[in-house]
C-alpha cells in the first residue's frame, strides 16, 4: 500500500511544497513543487491531489492539513528560524533549502 509524504524547500522568500510517494522506504516524486506565498501553494496542491483519484480522501486531507501547519509555521516567523528547528517541529516532512 503506497504512502505519501510532504517535502519542502525552505527558501528566503518562499516555501515550496511537494508530495512524494513512499514505497518500501523509497521516495518518488508525485507532484511538482508549489510555492507560497508567490502562488497559492495550498490550493494548487489541493487541486493536484484531487486530480489523482487513486489517492484516498483520508490521505489527501492528511497531506493538506500538514501543508497548512507548515505554511502557518513558515508565515508566523518560522522562515526566520533555522531549517533544523523546522525539521524538528515537522519530523514527518522532509525539509531542505538555503534559508
Curated annotation (Swiss-Prot):
Q: Which Gene3D superfamilies match?
A: 3.30.390.140
Which keywords accompany this UniProt record?
Answer: Ribonucleoprotein, Ribosomal protein
Give the UniProt record's GO annotations in the biological process aspect: translation
A GO term from the CC aspect: ribosome
Instruction: Return the InterPro entries for the record.
Output: PSRP-3/Ycf65_sf, Ribosomal_PSRP3/Ycf65
Q: Which cysteines are joined by disulfide bonds?
A: none
Question: Is Membrane there in the keyword field?
Answer: no
Among the GO molecular function terms of this UniProt record, one is:
structural constituent of ribosome
Protein function:
Probably a ribosomal protein or a ribosome-associated protein.
Q: Of which family is this protein a member?
A: Belongs to the chloroplast-specific ribosomal protein cS23 family.
The annotated subunit structure for this chain is:
Part of the 30S ribosomal subunit.
Q: Which PANTHER family match?
A: 30S RIBOSOMAL PROTEIN 3, CHLOROPLASTIC (PTHR35108), OS04G0461100 PROTEIN (PTHR35108:SF1)
What name appears for this protein in its UniProt entry?
Probable small ribosomal subunit protein cS23
Amino acid at each position: 500500500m503506497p504512502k505519501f509524504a510532504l517535502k519542502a524547500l525552505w527558501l528566503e522568500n518562499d516555501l515550496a511544497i511537494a508530495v512524494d510517494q513512499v514505497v518500501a522506504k523509497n521516495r518518488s516524486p508525485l507532484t511538482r513543487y508549489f510555492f507560497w506565498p508567490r502562488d497559492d501553494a495550498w490550493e494548487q496542491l489541493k487541486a493536484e491531489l484531487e486530480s489523482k483519484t487513486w489517492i484516498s480522501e483520508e490521505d489527501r486531507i492528511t497531506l493538506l492539513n500538514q501543508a497548512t501547519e507548515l505554511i502557518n509555521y513558515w508565515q508566523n516567523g518560522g522562515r526566520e528560524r533555522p531549517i533544523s528547528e523546522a525539521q524538528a517541529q515537522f519530523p514527518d516532512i522532509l525539509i531542505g533549502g538555503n534559508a
